[in-house]
Swiss-Prot record:
Residues 19-29, 454-464, 558-573 have a biased composition (Pro residues). It comes from Homo sapiens (Human). Gene3D superfamilies: Pleckstrin-homology domain (PH domain)/Phosphotyrosine-binding domain (PTB). The gene is NUMBL. This is Numb-like protein. Residues 233-245, 409-418 have a biased composition (Basic and acidic residues).
Length: 609
């Protein structure tokens, strides 16, 4: 360098001699330079101010910490700050490789771990969220099958358990924050050992053994699981001492009661004291068996039924059932068979007035009157009135007198059903009689058209001729006959009814109460007014009745007889269907009452049993 510099003629730069580089320094010797003395002093000062890491000591060299963890687990105060990675389903119930694969799978998912606290006790493992304090995992020790630290990660720890609902093997994985996975695994092992020890002690203390047979299909248990004092041996020995003393002491018969002595009642003495003091221990029972507590006999005796409803205990109460539900032996059935006769009873309701025709009393009165008149014979047809009443006006039957209802009994509903059946049978008999009468009427009409002596209906009877001697024209009978094309006056006008009877149509879908009410209404209308049955059966003229004696042919004063009366023109037979349609057209439209219990209801249907 000096020769080149001299040759070039430039200024010479002083040469700097560098110290040799250390042996282990990388790079060429020119780059290895030492720091000045001030820089080395500052570096030493900086290192002195830094926190030095503690020297790593393996878990096997720290047995004193493991002993502290074991005591904390038994007391239930052992906890570790961890990060909960999650859980996955595994195929095997044990194996370190199974746990390591589960940790790798959870870390590969990229799921964020939850900062939490792992509590380890002899009862189970609990994972609590450090931020929200939520319980993430609550695992019983009995379901844990395997736990181990991770050989690849120092702070990883996993355990395998059995899921209670799905019966699958689940692996839960953790990362310890301050401790190692070995310490967490050791703490879980201590918890499992404490749980097993507690279980063995419990089985030993209860003294329960099971003897299986040769086929292992049945077993016989000896002993009892009941213990008086949880885990205190002093209390477990107390019952044995008391039983031994009671067996050794001679039994003394109780003497007569002293005047000042009060003997305890059986209710105040506990069943346990009875068994300990009075009865010796059976030979087949074990010492740990404790007799069951039974209620004293005084508390089991019935003190009496509820007396809140005194009417229910009376004889006529429908809710009083001393026997089982056998229809022939029920008190109501027996009473109905014995005292069904209607005696002088007090009517349960007053007769309805003129103003309350649409009240409930009207319906009840109608039902009770139909009951009382069910067995009475039907009254005869009302006589034809020949007074000032016009021919077109219907004859009004006398109003039915009020009749008191029968005595109320517990089997009221059954009596109602019997009455309904009786009314139905009576209707069937009346229908048969009506059919027979109609046949007789037709025969009589045919005979009347051929007979020499004409007859006419009672409604068209001529007025009786005066008895005195007179000479006058014969009575004009034809003026009272209706025209041949006009319906008779009795076809549209029904006595006692403002409407023609509707055809009997079986109705389906009504309640039993409606059925009973309809049957009673029809019974009350049919029985006092049998004349309306003829109109229901058909619009045929009434049977021919011979004329009154006063209207028969009498000799004239001069000896010549009266001329024969001309035969009336036979009324055309009307079809029942046409008669009903004509009556429906002539009937005035009446507003339907809004009250369903009113007495003037329109009968829209009728049940025929």
């Amino acid at each position: 360098m000096s020769r080149s510099a001299a040759a070039s003629g430039g200024p010479r730069r002083p040469e700097r001699h560098l110290p040799p580089a250390p042996c282990g320094a990388p790079g060429p010797p020119e780059t290895c330079r030492t720091e000045p003395d001030g820089a080395g002093t500052m570096n030493k000062l900086r290192q002195s101010l830094r926190r030095r890491k503690p020297a790593y000591v393996p878990e096997a060299s720290r047995p004193h910490q493991w002993q502290a963890d074991e005591d904390a687990v038994r007391k239930g105060t052992c906890s570790f700050p961890v990060r909960y990675l999650g859980h996955v389903e595994v195929e095997e119930s044990r194996g370190m490789h199974v746990c390591e694969d589960a940790v790798k799978k959870l870390k590969a998912m990229g799921r964020k771990s939850v900062k939490s606290v792992l509590w380890v006790s002899a009862d189970g493992l609990r994972v609590v969220d450090d931020k929200t304090k939520d319980l993430l995992v609550d695992q019983t020790i009995e379901k844990v099958s395997f736990c181990a630290p991770d050989r690849n990660l120092d702070k990883a720890f996993s355990y395998i358990c059995r899921d209670g609902t799905t019966r699958r093997w689940i692996c839960h994985c953790f990362l310890a924050l301050k401790d190692s996975g070995e310490r967490l695994s050791h703490a879980v092992g201590c918890a499992f050992a404490a749980c097993l020890e507690r279980k063995q002690r419990r089985e030993k203390e209860c003294g329960v053994t099971a003897a299986f047979d040769a086929s292992r299909t049945s077993f016989a248990r000896e002993g009892s699981f009941r213990l008086s004092g949880g885990g205190r041996p002093a209390e477990r020995e107390a019952p044995d001492k008391k039983k031994a003393e009671a067996a050794a002491a001679p039994t003394v018969a109780p003497g007569p009661a002293q005047p000042g002595h009060v003997s305890p009642t059986p209710a105040t003495t506990s069943p346990g004291e009875k068994g300990e003091a009075g009865t010796p221990v059976a030979a087949g029972t074990t010492a740990a068996a404790i007799p069951r507590r039974h209620a004293p006999l005084e508390q089991l005796v019935r003190q009496g039924s509820f007396r809140g409803f005194p009417a229910l205990s009376q004889k006529n109460s429908p809710f009083k059932r001393q026997l089982s539900l056998r229809l022939n032996e029920l008190p109501s059935t027996l009473q109905r068979r014995t005292d069904f006769q209607v005696k002088g009873t007090v009517p349960e309701m007053e007769p309805p007035g003129a103003g309350d025709s649409d009240s409930i009393n009207a319906l009840c009165t109608q039902i009770s009157s139909s009951f009382a008149s069910a067995g009475a014979p039907a009254p005869g047809p009302p006589p034809a009135t020949t007074g000032t009443s016009a021919w077109g006006e219907p004859s009004v039957p006398p109003a039915a007198a009020f009749q008191p209802g029968h005595k109320r009994t517990p089997s009221e509903a059954e009596r109602w059903l019997e009455e309904v059946s009786q009314v139905a049978k009576a209707q069937q008999q009346q229908q048969q009689q009506q059919q027979q009468q109609q046949q007789q009427q037709q025969q009589q009409q045919q005979a009347a058209s051929v007979a020499p002596v004409p007859t006419m209906p009672p409604a068209l009877q001529p007025f009786p001729a005066p008895v005195g001697p007179f000479d006058a024209a014969p009575a004009q009978v034809a003026v009272f006959l209706p025209p041949p094309h006009m319906q008779p006056p009795f076809v549209p006008a029904y006595p006692g009814l403002g409407y023609p009877p509707m055809p009997r149509v079986p109705v389906v879908g009504i309640t039993p109460s409606q059925m009973v009410a309809n049957a009673f209404c029809s019974a009350a209308q049919l029985q006092p007014q049998p004349a309306t049955l003829l109109g229901k059966a058909g619009a045929f003229p009434p049977p021919a009745i011979p004329s009154a004696p006063g209207s028969q042919a009498r000799p004239r004063p001069n000896g010549a007889p009266w001329p024969p009366e001309p035969a009336p023109a036979p009324a055309p037979e009307l079809d029942p269907f046409e008669a009903q349609w004509a009556a429906l057209e002539g009937k005035a439209t009446v507003e339907k009452p809004s009250n369903p219990f009113s007495g003037d209801l329109q009968k829209t249907f009728e049940i025929e049993l």
